[in-house]
Amino acid sequence: MNVTTFQFVTWDGGGNLPPALGIAKELHQRGHAVRVIGEESQHAAVSSAGLSFTAWSHPLASGQAERSADERLTYLIKDVWLNTDLADEVCAVLAWQPADAVVVDCMLEGVLARSAEIPASTVVLVHGLFRSVLAMRDSLIAFGNQLRAAVGLPVLETNQLAWEAKDLVVVTTMREFDGVDDEPASNIRYVGPVLPDLDSTAGWPSPWEATDPRPLVLVSLSTMIGQGSSTLAQRVLDVLADNAIRVVMTTGSLSPETLNAPGNAVVFGVIPHEAILPEVAVMVTHGGHGSVMGALAHGVPLVCIPGVAADQPIVGERIEAVGVGRMVAPDAVGELGDTVAQVLSDTSYRTAARHMEALIRRLDGITGGASAVESALDQR
């Protein structure tokens, strides 16, 4: 029996890996061979999913902690997202181990620009809002052209990085949340968010009695280095200390020991949100798509303090547009306590969040995403 092979191509962007792995694992469970090209920092997660892994010849986004935020962004744009040389590595892997379809992270524009050279069907995996990816592509092309012009390279026309020739674009969100007005092209499939551990039965070490009547607020400002700064995290804890609530903060890459938790709060480094969300009344988020979808999948309304990534302010705007929460500017965190209190008291936010919960659970992005990727084989 012939086995169909899918090659995933990714980079270490934090929240971009779980959707790719969720779909890849489902394809593997359906009997397909699945391989992943990624960064060494992703090796353990990919291998633990039972998938074959090949590392890029050098680190891409990982190992950039010593750079300033501006330096990191410039590096990502030039050496990761717009790096057409990465396509050579993809083609080399495929020459050694052919695949029937290649699933490429939407941010790897340099690889997608040369997809005509890839001897397989090409699937673009959008791990967030399609509208934010389109906005970022325009910015990337403009910024990349500035970099190219500065070193005497010819600029790229927009259509050189277009997706028109791609076989399939899989978007792991809901069209209702994305808010794209135009009817999507026939090769664009909204499959819903990919949430592998949606109904986790894992517990978490709550310091409070089960009978404590105060609402529980989950705060997560990003697992990515350079976003969830200790200054912002401490400011959030201090502001929420005056509210009659219980606060659970997860800090990701920040050490909890760097923060002073007030009496109504507890701080963890990493703890699965799925274990806490069934008890949560409101989530305070940086606007990462995965975190937001995880909360909405449990019917939890949100307060968004947008992070530095380009899509996060757009996610915050969509949170307000669909009525599932409010947005607070990073320089107006002093308003956070009042905003959280408003979202807690106004039941319309919870009602809207529960509507989104029903949509997410009906779509099931894991099975829908895997089926969409399989359909790319029919277009060869």
Indicate residue ranges for each PLM-predicted region:
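Donor-nucleotide binding loops and adjacent catalytic segments primarily
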Residues: 178, 182-282
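Catalytic-core helical/loop segments in enzymes performing group transfer/polymerization on anionic/lipid-linked
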Residues: 8-10, 28-32, 37, 151-153, ...
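A broadly tuned preference for mixed-charge, low-complexity surface segments
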Residues: 90, 153-164, 218-233, 272-274, ...
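Glycosyltransferase specificity loop/lid
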Residues: 1-134, 138, 142-146, 248-303, ...
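Flexible, charged surface loops at secondary-structure boundaries
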Residues: 1, 94-98, 162-166, 210-212, ...
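Short beta-strand segments
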Residues: 105, 171, 220
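Active-site-proximal region of nucleotide-activated glycan assembly enzymes
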Residues: 117-187
